């Protein structure tokens, strides 16, 4: 085995795919985020043999995929559902990452 791999502790990577509601408002984003947080709690508890250190979610896991022309007409409609780095969603994900000492990635 390569020496570099001898220095890396084995861990579990959780690759998550959940049902996502297409967000019409911030409440829908919260519902999607709550579902994601519950999946993290479940996954960390399920894979107890090796600690979970990485959780990966797909793109749009908080807002869902929207289609321009189907009710969304301007950048303002998209900005109402935008996730910002200093916003509450990122704070909650950061808290969850610290709780379990892991990294969370999402598109």
Q: Where on the chain are the PLM-derived regions?
A:
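Hydrophobic structural segments
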Residues: 1-107
